[in-house]
Amino acid sequence: VDRRTFLQLSALGAGGLLLPSTRLIAAEQLLVPADTARNRRLADAALAAAKAAGASYCDVRVGRYLRQFVVTREAKVENVVNGESIGVGVRVIADGAWGFAATNTLTSDGVANAARQAIAIARANARMADRRVELAPVTPAGTVSWRTPIKRNAMEVPVAEKVALLLDVNAAAMNAGADFAASRLFAINEQKYFASSDGSWIDQDIHRLWLPFTVTAVDKASGKFRTRDGLGAPVGMGYEYLDGDAAQKHHLPGGLIAYGMSYDAREDAVAAAKQARAKLSAPSVKPGKYDLVIDPSNLFLTIHESVGHPLELDRVLGYEANYAGTSFATVDKRDAGFRWGSPLVNFVADKTRAGSLGAVGYDDEGVKTKQWDLVRDGILVDYQCTRDQAHILGKTESDGCSYADAWSSVQFQRMPNVSLAAGKQPLDVAKMVAGVEKGLYIHGRGSYSIDQQRYNAQFGGQLIYEIEHGKVTRLVEDGAYQIRTPEFWNSVSAICDESDFRLGGSFFDGKGQPSQVSAVSHGSATTRFDGVNVINTARSLG
């Protein structure tokens, strides 16, 4: 990847597109199918070499990672990049310790050498280890395959069609009053072949898609400007997500529109331009206590930061302390029946939900994915773990949470989809709002900060509206809600029903050293929180 491309990707926060040994290719090469027969030969060669060298366990990941991104601004195409990265990662246990090595030499000798290198690393690690690796058992999968259920492969869509869509989005925003408009499209295809000495040969074809945009309105007299980002979620779907199906739209109080499993980016861009312009003259929020009605387009990030991350077992145990901190949610709290939220609060971990970013058939340890409870009726009941962590919790199986972002990266525990279950009683957003006397209605991801134990945080929003006497009234600016994680989730007094359930997500979630990125969804229905402190972010002490 050249310097210009690197800088553009970094500025977009899309470092996850910059995989090792990425080569730039023509768009047509994105359509070359995976060579499953070759992958099987390479995997078997690595397994045989590891066994011959004394490994008690070995797994092999043959990965082909395809990335395409298109970047536009107003009527210009700024960049189109197609990238491919192919290689093999070999992980072993020898003398009770882990070892890992990787290669992009796609020959039997090349992968056998990587296996032997992994053995040497494991034996070196064993000399310093104070305990042996304990792997939870896994049911061998045999020879299986899994595909993201897509209707239209984004890689098959001509670049010209993608460019036309993005330029239409920009034009729609500009025609509706925006001064600037920038849109991007990210399409990712992970072709992953996993084999292990347990007896699994798993071929997976995984697709993800995201169309983010930002529109800007400027007050030329004062120089003041305001932005509004797109409200479309990143998804584990094909290009069909961008068809704008009217049946997937949610018409909400205040004339707002939200999107389910289909996204009309042009329509959203028109609304964004008008709302960015309205934000220029919106009054600043009055700080104080409010009842909050939070849309899934905002709440997903709060779930991600205050529930998903603190319940990663490696973070709980302190293994992530150098990078984004630890967790207040220590294992003794689970054992004591710690109250995480009100009895309405149920958090579900899931690696199977169709359309979600985290959906796969098997994780990167060959564990079949599933759904399980993290918080049940407000009580902390479980965490997220991998095969070598399960025994710490007294569990007999992994949760299927292992992931590596590239063939050259070692797999480790990553967050599954974590969602707040919808309410069990019929309730729509209009009725929820009607019951609020003094509140705020919050949409879209804003700026945020959270402490090193995932306990104290604050979150802003793209759009914040006042609620007075059961009605959505005016748009306000400069608001952010403050939380202490348990207090915040214990303030939940109502959750809309399943008909309002929607996914948000993080397309580039960072973790680990060296850093890796993963993609993860978080779903919820619109949720009410009572008596939450809201600050004015524009105020200064002076």
What residues fall within each predicted segment?
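N-terminal small-residue-enriched
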Residues: 2-542
